[in-house]
Amino acid sequence: MTIRNHTLGFPRIGLNRELKKAQESYWAGNISQAELLAVGKELRARHWQQQANAGVELLPVGDFAWYDQVLGTSLLLGNIPPRHRNEDGRLDLDTLFRVARGRAPTGKPAAASEMTKWFNTNYHYIVPEFQQGQSFTLAWQQLLDEVDEALALGHNVKPVLLGPITYLWLGKVKGPEFDRLSLLDAILPVYQQVLSQLQQKGIEWVQIDEPALVLDLPIEWQNAYQVAYQALTGQVKLLLTTYFDGITHHLDIIKNLPVNGLHIDLCAGQDALQVIHQALPKDWVLSLGVINGRNVWKADLTTRYQQVVALKGKRPLWIGTSCSLLHSPIDLSAETKLDDEVKSWFAFAVQKCAEVALLAKALNAPEGEYDEQLAQYSAPIRQREHSSRVHNAKVAARLQAINAQDGERTSPYQQRAKVQRARFNFPLWPTTTIGSFPQTTEIRTVRLDFKKGRIDTTAYRTNISEHIKQAIDEQERLGLDVLVHGEAERNDMVEYFGEHFEGYVFTQNGWVQSYGSRCVKPPVIIGDISRPAPITVDWATYAQSLTDKPVKGMLTGPVTILCWSFPREDVSRETIAKQIALALRDEVDDLQKAGIGIIQIDEPALREGLPLRRDEWQAYLDWAVDAFKLSAAIADDETQIHTHMCYCEFNDIMEAIAALDADVITIETSRSDMELLEAFEHFDYPNEIGPGVYDIHSPNVPNVEWIVGLLRKAQSRIPAERLWVNPDCGLKTRGWSETRAALANMVEAAKYLRQNV
């Protein structure tokens, strides 16, 4: 039995972020839709060829998306909210962009659909909206067209389709409540149609993604799998594909499904391979996700080989990536500034494709034939264990010395609140922003020129100072109560801190997609983390010197820095988070000693870090909360600690959020129409809260009445004296004109409420 190899998906953005640049040019009206479509086509062809050149046998087709793959599935099924439809009912690319962004070059603007995290990653998807009794039709040909493209180029094609159960699971009911699983019967005929058309094109295998199978599913959702796949069987071979965790808890359901194979994630999951093998029908393909699609580390192929060789010849096997390579940067060969030692530890998407191919080749050869080649390939990752760049004795000693008192503020919130009110004397409904202001071309050019050595430190600091002054002046003109310095010096809220920590390295081109055209370049944690010197104090004190109003110090929290970095794999996430927390603790202390009275420690990734299985939640929340408190508890009573969270469902982690003991929490609520506040109301959240009053991911400017309406909803759940007024998130991706207009309306709404409540 020959062992085949494949990938579950490939990054779509392009090595130089060509997709991002083309999307944004199109949205700005600088290129035509035809030009945008041409960029997409060129990227797909390039990416298929890169995988084929690396030795990948079965190429994923359908992993390309103009925004995200869930939204692509919504279009495929004709599931478009009425407010985003064209008047003639047809779907086009602008329809897709209106759903995602609230506006597009054509069509009427309307509120964007909600966006949330893709499982426990830092990737996002647009949440499908469902209404009772709605119908579905095959309305979007993108997948079928792309299959034709790949076939025409001579590739061995494996289409990728998001499965019906996971699609329904990821969506949300809009309007009167009903069981969205009841829509399954309406959706299945469209899936049947798609599979039929793929069969007619000569497709043998379809990768049907059902990552919901790694979750704790209600019994009715578990049972729905049999119904769904009974309807879908018989046209093409189906590879039921799971990732991000194990599936042993649903093995009894899976083994009885009428599919032809199963893909499991052996990097994130703890499944016992022999148990899975014994349970599955012997003629099924078992696809083993042994090359980690979510990190940048080279695989120890010797270990991976030993992990799977026992199954060789016992059943049909495929070797693959654990998940889509979407979560990995594209090509390590583009990194020319990493030193040779560190570079030898890494593998990006292209290199991971080669790992998949090499491992499959070794498994297909007589046992032992590739031992030397695998050992040679894996040698750097083994040598790393002894590198002095990885281990720091001082950090280890400081971690060892942490005690329970280090995580507790001096006084409880009620006492701190009195001290802080006396210090700041804010009005009711105090207004603020979340931290960043528009990152203009000018700001980005200054940072790039400094990075490339085209300007010196003096010129750089003068330029950044001017932008900070502009941000302070703008906020004073608008009448905001608590100001921020605008973060002109920061390229990214995690990378900026990583650049000032020891234990990190940075890539030139290690971009990964976060959502739509938004890309991030996560830093890589290669060793123990420490802070050699203050990071934010200079800019914070400069900004504070420009105004009598308080200026917030802005830090990214330990859990978010961890979640939005590529972490080490040789120590626990808890250890990394606490190392970061100790570094931030020193920064908090330096800020307050420098006269900064309000310090925001952002933790937008707190929920994202949750394990996918609920029985593992508490252990994670315990150390995540401990890490935050360790970073913040050095603050004096009169220092007000804020935190910010976004894209969150809070109901099930309210105790942990309250346990953070931040004086003020700001959250993203506008897209969900303040629904998230129900959690705070039912829990009787004791501290202050700033529910986001407008969606910064959309360029639409909210009017005063809209904001007042949202704040009245908020006030029906939280007493006015504990409410703050702020946008959903930072404003770095917005333009100044829409930012001014939106903040002016926000301040006006707060003033109106002060006079009318």
UniProtKB/Swiss-Prot annotation:
Enzyme Commission number, as recorded: 2.1.1.14
Binding-site residues, Zn(2+): 644, 646, 668, 729
UniProt keyword list: Amino-acid biosynthesis, Metal-binding, Methionine biosynthesis, Methyltransferase, Repeat, Transferase, Zinc
Record: residues binding 5-methyltetrahydropteroyltri-L-glutamate: 17-20, 117, 518-519, 564, 608
Membrane-traversing stretches: none
Chemical reaction(s) catalysed: 5-methyltetrahydropteroyltri-L-glutamate + L-homocysteine = tetrahydropteroyltri-L-glutamate + L-methionine
HAMAP family: Meth_synth (MF_00172)
Name used for this protein in its record: 5-methyltetrahydropteroyltriglutamate--homocysteine methyltransferase
Annotated source species: Proteus mirabilis (strain HI4320)
